[in-house]
Amino acid sequence: FFKALLFLGAGSVIIAMHHNENMWDMGGLRKRMPVTYATFLVGSLALAGIVPFAGFWSKDEVLYEALIHGLGTEGSLGTVFLAAYAMGLLAVLFTGFYTFRMVALTFHGEPRTDLAADPESVGWNVKGPLSVLGLLAATTGFLNLAPVKKLTGAKVDFLHQWLEGPEGAALMATLSAKHYKHLLHDVNPAHVTASELGPLLPAALSLGLAVTGALVAFRLYATPEPTEHTAKLGGLQDVLYNNYYQDEYQVWLATNVVQPLAGVADTVDQSLVDGVVDGVSSVSLSSG
């Protein structure tokens, strides 16, 4: 829900800004687009994995399972699980940062252009779906309460049971045994069980990283002049602003490497390959 909400919210902002998609030309839109702002904020909180919004539950469970299997698995496979957990935590930090950088630049501070100061009105044909998706993003995470079950012992994982069906657990066990036998033969979660570690500490860690990223983004970008600190980056600012010059590199690669190679291949194909084929055909025809 929250990803659809953010896409639709971005569309609402683009409509209001007369199809200007540059966040540096925005600012202060929360006062002029309150419905879009409120729903977009809900989607951003969910994407960043802030409790109790929908994204927190799915993100936390993935990280928790990676940690449990990493601590309970011997050898290199356990290291892989722990590396995945560490990369997941790093992604949590950066997701919180870039998500709320987007929120701060778009909706907070002061309008940085005339368009942002007087945006076009967006109708309820857009705001209505935004409101529905915002409500779902704020509430449906509670349907996935497996972490709460692990913490309290309450039988609240009905969504898992419904998705698996009456024979789902047995089917998944059969598939796992059949297809992942060699991969999982070293996994021994009994070394570190969920009851020993508990979900609260890992959840608090990931939540803390998400909040830290969000707060840093707000500190840097929810200001009247968010470009002041970026100017201190010097040449690095140009590299980042131009997306590491990936577009320019790909154009250079296509123009200076791919096209010449394609030309050589075409020449060889037409003159050598086709020439041999045509020559053999001509000899065959002339020899009767």
Regions flagged by a language model, labelled:
Residues I15-F53, G78-A91, D114-T140, G235-L240:
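Interfacial and helix-entry/exit segments of alpha-helical transmembrane bundles
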